[in-house]
Amino acid sequence: MINKIDNIQTDSEIHMKKCIKNFKTNINNIHIGRISPNILNNIRVDYYGISTPLSQVANAIVEDSRTLAITVFDHQLIKSTEKAIFMSDLELIPISYGNTIRVTLPALTEERRHTLIKMVRTEAEKSKIAVRSVRRIANDKTKILLKNKEINEDEEHFFQNEIQKLTNIWIKEIDIILAEKESELMKF
């Protein structure tokens, strides 16, 4: 019985850590001073009717601190690649030159800073929801153990408190990362 609870707790912690890792990855794609090919990680291109990650249909390299050169592998995908970049929430404007698409990072205005901060806050909220979802799943599993009389009510209550402590720790971690990123965005 205790072993099952430990497994649930361990699994919950692993999933919560993954939520934090995904959050860090997502906000690290939000750059302000220097452009990086990673900024394109979440962009998907219509590849003959299939939504495909941009990295699988093109190669992006840094030309200078504010410009990316994207070489599309299949010449027929240039228009759909341009459209995917333009339609993303990154506010990038793609310009094609033959098989190459150039993307320039927009100038960082006060309005752009606030837009980026909103994006980071949205990602933070999504991550908090994901952590809380892990908590809910763990609590549901303990309720099943209680229902099956594998644990008693005291054990269920204790375990739910432990999961809540974990949830609080990871949500606080998200808040710390968010504050650091907001500070970084306001410095530039």
Curated annotation (Swiss-Prot):
Using the record, list the residue span of the signal peptide; answer none if the entry has no such feature: none
GO cellular-component term (any): cytosol
Q: Which SUPFAM superfamilies does the entry link to?
A: Ribosome recycling factor, RRF
One Pfam family per UniProt: RRF
What compartments host this protein?
Answer: Cytoplasm
Among InterPro entries, the record links this protein to: Ribosome_recyc_fac, Ribosome_recyc_fac_dom, RRF_sf
Going by the UniProt record, its keywords in alphabetical order are:
Cytoplasm, Protein biosynthesis
Q: One GO biological process from the UniProt record?
A: cytoplasmic translational termination
The molecular function GO annotations come to: ribosomal large subunit binding
Q: Tell me which NCBIfam families the record gives.
A: frr
Q: Which family does it belong to?
A: Belongs to the RRF family.
Q: Which PANTHER family match?
A: MITOCHONDRIAL RIBOSOME RECYCLING FACTOR PSEUDO 1, RIBOSOME RECYCLING FACTOR
Describe the function of this protein. Answer: Responsible for the release of ribosomes from messenger RNA at the termination of protein biosynthesis. May increase the efficiency of translation by recycling ribosomes from one round of translation to another.
Q: What is this protein called?
A: Ribosome-recycling factor
Organism of origin: Blochmanniella pennsylvanica (strain BPEN)
